[in-house]
Structures are given as structure tokens and as C-alpha cells.
Amino acid sequence: MERNSSDDEEDHQHLIPQNDTRIRHREDSVSSNATTIGGNQRSAFQIDDILHRVQHRGKISLNKRYVIVFVSLIISIGLLFLLTDPRELFAANFSSFKLDPLSNRVKESELRALYLLRQQQLALLSLWNGTLVNPSLNQSENALGSSVLFEDVKSAVSKQISLNKEIQEVLLSPHRSSNYSGGTDVDSVNFSYNRCRKVDQKLSDRKTVEWKPRSDKFLFAICLSGQMSNHLICLEKHMFFAALLDRVLVIPSSKFDYQYDRVIDIERINTCLGRNVVVAFDQFKEKAKKNHFRIDRFICYFSSPQLCYVDEEHIKKLKGLGISIDGKLEAPWSEDIKKPSKRTVQDVQMKFKSDDDVIAIGDVFYADMEQDWVMQPGGPINHKCKTLIEPSKLILLTAQRFIQTFLGKNFIALHFRRHGFLKFCNAKSPSCFYPIPQAAECIARIVERSNGAVIYLSTDAAESETSLLQSLVVVDGKIVPLVKRPPRNSAEKWDALLYRHGIEDDSQVDAMLDKTICAMSSVFIGASGSTFTEDILRLRKDWGTSSTCDEYLCRGEEPNFIAEDE
């Protein structure tokens, strides 16, 4: 229903009577002032007008400020968006707000992973302890194969335990606080394992003889078969014979044999024994001038296929040195080089004992006499050095300088015999001549096992073979460098000693330098059937550098391809 205006006015009067009274009072006052002070009416209206304008201007000024602030804010936000990536700006806050449940789940997963890894570590440690206390695994009838497998298992377990601990450290690092102490008894256990550790030579178990020769009794060494490595092995056996027969050993002349004093220190042998047990040929000749310079008795260890393994040409060389040979070549027993019999100390003393001043025995390289004694670390003779026959001081120092320059401490040495080895190996069963790709696989396995950084290559192989071998020796996707001794370079000083003493171009010095470097390696890979390799193994055994990872190339394998016979 509509209401008229009078009703509205009545309601208004009832609702706000105070306002109405003030209005009426103000109107009465204005009216009275206008009546009594007519001249001042204009002035009063001017003041009201001024106040009204001031208020109006204030409102305008305030509005301008709001506009300026608003525009500035818009510009600032625009610049912020232009100069930064909005996603990066709000990523941290939004992600922390939205992904907090996921973050909690990640933490729970990490802690769960830590628990599982700890359980794995305990299980591996249990396996590890079981391998250590079960020596029967190393004493099985399949000695070689089972021992290698056993060592590989132990190495793998050790690596897994180390990896396990590393993973735990990574997962645990975000959860650590300043007062965290999460160590356990397991962490304090030393489970490190060196797969290619040094071999315990058990020197206390050596069986030796004393070498105390009579100063007027001599044994002339005859070593003719093979090259320098054969002769050095022969010379070591001659020392054993001289010790058993109480004689001074005469080192052969370079006109009849190799020049031994260039590669080994002869006088050092006397120092190791503490007495004169060996004498150079020239010294022997000076002593013999007082008497008749001759060989009183020439005894042959082998009777076939040729007495003493000596031909007429070598007899002429001996006589050319001014030595006369009384009597004929004789053999105390029937002995074939191809099938040598096992002989004892008593056999030698009985068959080779003589009252003659000078006797010669040859050739004893193939002699199979007390091999257990001969193959001991340091040999069968009691002395105070590590070994009696070792490289000269010049060669030792040069080898050390080469290793410091090119190889470092942890390196593998490889004797890779190729020249003339194909026919030699194929005459054996099984053959020992391996195709390059197969050889590379065998080498890579040893590198992986030993963690060697570089390989020193001692070889007579052609460049075509060594280049292919280099490209194929790959471990973990990386080619393992093969290092050979470089040609002479005046800027390099590692070989300065050899040049200073004028022996840099001697092939036997080079060969002995190669042997020395190989003998000092962390791990050695040799060539089966090579006496060069055997002499390196002798040095490693005597020096205590032999490793449990030392082995012949591709040991236990046959070549995957063998050529037919001629």
C-alpha cells in the first residue's frame, strides 16, 4: 500500500527529533543575525564558500595521491614480472604449501630405504665373516679355480658393503642435526679388502744352505742355452752348486758369455754373504797366473743330446781366453735335457765332489734339482739380502725414475711376448699364443679386478699389434693407457744415469730395465713359457712385490683360434 508524503514526514519527525530541533535552532539563529547585522551577511557567506572550496581541493589532492600510488604499484608489479620468472618467484611458497604431503612421503621412503640398506649391510657382513672363518674354501682340491673364485667373491662382497655404506651416508645426510650421532658397531668394523694384496712369502719357513767356500777352490760357470734370462737363471743354480761343493764361483768372461757386470752388481753378492763367494773372470785370471791357468775337470750335468750343451765353437772361445782344458768332457750320469730327472742335494755332492782346484759344470739351466729350495723367496742360500741376483744400482734408479715420471704407484705391468712366439706356443699343448682381441679381454678383467690406472707394456710386438691391443683394452667404457718406454728425449731426465755411464744403447741393459719396471708393478701379467717372465716372477717373489692377482696372460684359457701346423 502506498504511503503519502505527509506520512513520511511524520515518521521522519518521530525518528530524528534531535536533528530537527538543531535545524530549527540554526535557522532561527541565522534569521536573527540577518536581521540585526545586515551588513555582515556577505562576509559570512564568503567564509563558508572558502571553507567549502578548501575541503573540495583537499578531496581532489587526496584522490591524486591515491592515483599516484596506484599507478606506481602497477609499474612496480610490471617491472617485477618483466625482470623475474613468475614461476620461480612463487615456486618455493606454492610448492611448500601444496607438496608438503609428498615431501613427508619422500622422507618416509628415505628412512625406509635406510632401514633396508642397513639390513642388507648386516646380511653382507654375515657373509663376509663366514668367508673369513672358513679356510676350507681355500683348501679344496680344485686349488687354482676355486681359489680365484673365492677371491672374486670376497672382493665383490667388500665392494658391496662399501657401496651400501656410501648410499646410507647420502640418504642420511639431509636428516642429520648438529647433535646427531648415528654411528653403530657395524660402522666401526674394518671390512676393507684388497683383492690384489701382496703375497705372504713366509720367509721364516725358508730352507737354506750355507755358502762358505774354500778360497783356493773354484767352480767355472758354463751357461750357454737361450738368452740373458736363461743365463741368469743358470747362474743362480750355479751358485747353489758352488755352495754345496764349497767353491768360489767364477763369473764367465764377456768374450765367452754376456757382460754380466753391466746388468747385475757382482760385488754386491759378496756383500750379501759377508765373504768372497764370487769372483769376476779377470780377477780369477790374475789369481790363476800364479799357477797354471786351466780347468782341471769339465763335468757335464746333461749327457744328451750333447755333452754339457757345449759345441766346438765354445770350446775354442774358452781356449781363446788362455784357458787350457785338461781331459775330456765327462758326464757323471745319464741325463737328457728333454726329460730331466729330479735330483737331490746328496746326488750333486756325490757326483760332482772333486779335489781339483778348478772345475767347470755346464749347462745347468734345465737341471731339476731341489726345486722347492730353488724357488724359495731369496733362493736356496742363506744370506742377508732380499735376493742375490738383482739389477745393478744404475738400472734400479732408472726404473724408479721412469715409474715416478710415467706410471705412479698403482700400475699393472704386462710382458706381451709376440716375436717368434707363435710357432713356439703352437708347438705346446695348449698353445700360449692368443689373438689380440682375446688377449685384450683377459687384460681388461685383471685391470677391473686390480683397479690399475695404467699398464706398462714390455713387448717385442709390432706396432700394428700394440695399436690394436691399445684400442681394445677398455674398462668401464674407458681405454686403459698402455705405456712403453719412449725413445731418447733430452728434455726427459729419467734415463740420464744410463747416458752418463754410456750404457744407454745396450740391449741387455734395456731388457733388464724392462724386467725391473715389471718387477716393481702392483700387478704383473706374464707370458707363459717365457724365461723373461720367469725371471720377473723371481724378482717379484724375492722383493716381496708379488700380488695375488699376478698371473699368466689368459691363464686357464685356450686360444679361440689356432693355426694349423706347417
Curated annotation (Swiss-Prot):
The keyword Lipid metabolism does not apply. The chain crosses the membrane at residues 66-86. It is a single-pass type II membrane protein. Gene3D superfamilies: 3.40.50.11350. Glycans are attached at N93, N129, N138, N179, N190. Its EC number is 2.4.1.-. Substrate binds at H415, F416, R417, T531, F532. Keywords: Carbohydrate metabolism, Fucose metabolism, Glycoprotein, Glycosyltransferase, Membrane, Signal-anchor, Transferase, Transmembrane, Transmembrane helix. Residues 1-37 are annotated as: Disordered. CDD domains: O-FucT_like. GO terms for molecular function: peptide-O-fucosyltransferase activity. One of its GO terms (biological process) is fucose metabolic process. One of its GO terms (cellular component) is membrane. The keyword Transferase applies. Pathway: Glycan metabolism. Residues 1-14 have a biased composition (Basic and acidic residues). Its main location: membrane. It is found in: Membrane. Belongs to the glycosyltransferase GT106 family. This is O-fucosyltransferase 36. It comes from Arabidopsis thaliana (Mouse-ear cress). The lineage of its organism: Eukaryota, Viridiplantae, Streptophyta, Embryophyta, Tracheophyta. The gene is OFUT36.
